Structures are given as structure tokens and as C-alpha cells.
Amino acid sequence: MAPVKKLVAKGGKKKKQVLKFTLDCTHPVEDGIMDAANFEQFLQERIKVNGKAGNLGGGVVTIERSKSKITVTSEEPFSKRYLKYLTKKYLKKNNLRDWLRVVANSKESYELRYFQINQDEEEEEDED
């Protein structure tokens, strides 16, 4: 039986995993019910890195805004679900939670959409 050689990776440096999530606030910003700059400021104050809010880990997490899209980039593990949680918290704080919902439109992005209310169903209920 031939001796089995074990392959050992030399210089085992891991690649930095860069996570990039986008929040599309186009509809509410165009309608004027929400301010993207205010939302960006809220995220900067509230995102926790290593258990501390407000410091963004000294550049580990970056938040960028282009018109009505906000991009959150992280070099450390960062949950997309946490971003949804903070977005819902912002909507609740600004009394927008009744009109807007957070929907995942791709693997790395969320979109703020209005609730679809069928007016036909409401009219039928009123007639009864």
C-alpha cells in the first residue's frame, strides 16, 4: 500500500468576505413620505458592530446613499435579516409601518413597497 500524502495549504490566508446589501426606497422617497438621508442617518446610529451601536466598527461596515438607494457593505459577517429588522424599526418610529412593507426582491436587496389594498373587496363589504 502506497503512503498517503496529506495536502497542507501553506499561508492559509482567507479572503475577506465582503457582504453588500441594498435597500431600495424609491417609491416612498418619490412620493415625499420618507427621507432617504434621514433613514441613512438612522442606520448609522443603530447598526451594531461587536455589540456597540454607532461606531460601525471603525470602517468594517459602510453605508452609502445614492438618491433613494442605500447600500450597506460589511467586511464582517452581517445579517440581511438584521437590516430588515432595523428598517421595520425605522418605519414604526416614523409612523410609516401601516403603509409600507419590506420585501426581498433579490438575494442581496430589500425594497420598500406599499401594501396592496383591494378597494373592490372593501366596497363589497360596505354594501352588506
Swiss-Prot record:
- Mention any Pfam family matching this sequence: Ribosomal_L22e
Phosphothreonine PTM positions read 62
Compartments, record wording: Cytoplasm
Q: What is its main location?
A: cytoplasm
Q: Which Gene Ontology BP annotations are present?
A: alpha-beta T cell differentiation; cytoplasmic translation; translation at presynapse
Recite the UniProt keywords alphabetically: Cytoplasm, Heparin-binding, Phosphoprotein, Ribonucleoprotein, Ribosomal protein, RNA-binding
**List-wise, which residues carry Phosphoserine?**
66
Q: Name one GO molecular function term.
A: identical protein binding
Record PTM N6-succinyllysine, positions in chain: 69
SUBUNIT field: Component of the large ribosomal subunit.
Q: Which family does it belong to?
A: Belongs to the eukaryotic ribosomal protein eL22 family.
The protein's name in its UniProt record: Large ribosomal subunit protein eL22
Query: Species lineage, top-down?
Result: Eukaryota, Metazoa, Chordata, Craniata, Vertebrata
Q: Name the gene that codes for it.
A: Rpl22
